[in-house]
Amino acid sequence: HTPGHTPACLTYVIGDAAFVGDTLFMPDYGPARADFPGGDARALYRSIQRILALPAHTRIFVGHDYPPADRTKPAWETSIAAQRDHNVHVKSGISEDAFVTMREARDQTLEAPSLILPALQVNIRAGRLPPAEPGHKVQLKLPVNAI
């Protein structure tokens, strides 16, 4: 269990591989945001530290990638050593308080993801779509005046 991005985040360690979902991204991007429902920057830092305590040779597979401007191709695999040495926000030596301050300040500048409302509706239903309405249409309903 590696909460922080959301309270439900998990990391699966199988042999020399760790599947971290959205907890960590590639070192040149940093970790996940922590401002989603139930997210917590301090819990995220502690989860990342548990991941970074794995052996240096452990391969990390990220859930998705946001290539920065100086990297044109998406990536999906990194290592504990690369994260410790090069992660722009949580490399070795970053204190918990410094990380929490940075993460919370940065999260305040980020817009909500474009698909957050439909994603929340499906997540709340444990991945199930709502029942079909008359005419056999399955619809997600979005509020027009609130998030």
Task: Tell where the protein language model's regions lie, with residue ranges.
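Catalytic core of the metallo-beta-lactamase
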Residues: 1-68, 147
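Accessory terminal helices/loops
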Residues: 46-59, 66-147
